[in-house]
Amino acid sequence: MKSTLIIGCGIAGLTACRLLESKTAVYLCEKDRIGGLCIPNLDYYDRAIQENGYAFGAYGDHMFHTENPYIAKLFKSIYPTAVAYEHRTEIFVNGKFLPYPPNIKTLQHATVDEIVAPYTAKQWGEQSTDDITHILKRFTTYNDYDYRTFKDRYQYVPYAMDYGKPFISPDVDTLDITNHTEMDYEDVLECDHDLIINTSPLDKFYGKDFLKYRSLEFEVGIDYGNNFKDRAMTINYPERTFAYTRVHHHGKYIVYEYPSETGLPMYPVYNPDKSLELIRKELPELQYHSVLGCNCRFFVHKCGNKIILHVGRLGSYQYLNIDKAMMSTVGAITWLTVQENFFQDK
């Protein structure tokens, strides 16, 4: 049986683990966070469960939403304790709390330019119109009074209960999780695994530093005045008056979210007109593959008898929702199975 090493154990790595556990021997390499950004804040876990009945995220509110029934079922197999939940978000602009994404009510009190452009520049650190145009295209407006953040058929929160612990088959060797430091290309060349699935930052895997990332910092406070009782769970603050970009409130706990250029890489500063061209220039050995019917991709690197797949938000260097990060991984493993016959005994 072939052997697979998965680098990183966020949603893309967990998806690969779930899909491959019956096909190969699977080894996980992760320093400290099983679940990636979808983990609860363990410092406040017991108190939050006791006082609110649920936990809140260590890295803000991360919600799974999709129209794809296969991806929804796969997500539930990874997070069996995930809870069905429809999120609400507001934005504070012109002195008012308004629904977000903008709906009819929002646009009665503020323009799209007042809402989207300043928030995008603040969150991503991009100032020029050329830099943020591709980011603005991701935003949507609703021609109704629906307050929900997402309208997808399947919506879950992964970490509400049971520590948000993802399912990992007992057949998967997890010994490497706490013993490994970060692995890179040189380490991979020396390992004995046939397949390597990388979900860590693409350029840094090859010992380079040509791609931009954004990070976030979080500060937990107490809402002694119960000021957010009737507000949405997440509130966006686009105006420069506020240093933070979002506030997440969970009972009396208030989590302030600040953008940062340093720290744990969380979001690729991806420009579709520039980033892919730069990747092809700096890493010409990579093969590019798009996933059919999905605005996501993966990269393939064949080196000797090994195959390296780069998937997920950081591995494929794309800004992706949870479902699209999973689809990047599903697409890569499907390609490996169908096009390469990789898992057939030879």
Residue ranges and their predicted role:
Residues 21-46:
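Glycine-rich FAD pyrophosphate-binding loop
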Residues 47-112, 118:
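Dinucleotide-binding Rossmann-like beta1-alpha1 core, especially the glycine-rich loop
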Residues 10-12, 32-35, 121-125, 184-186, ...:
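Short, solvent-exposed loop/turn segments at secondary-structure junctions
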Residues 272-346:
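C-terminal catalytic lobe of FAD-dependent flavoproteins
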Residues 15, 70, 327-331:
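Short amphipathic alpha-helical face segments that pack within enzyme cores
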Residues 2-27, 333:
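N-terminal Rossmann-like FAD-binding beta1-loop-alpha1 element of flavoenzymes
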Residues 87-90, 94-195, 199, 203-206:
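Active-site/ligand-binding neighborhood in enzyme catalytic cores
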Residues 183-298:
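Mid-domain catalytic core of redox enzymes
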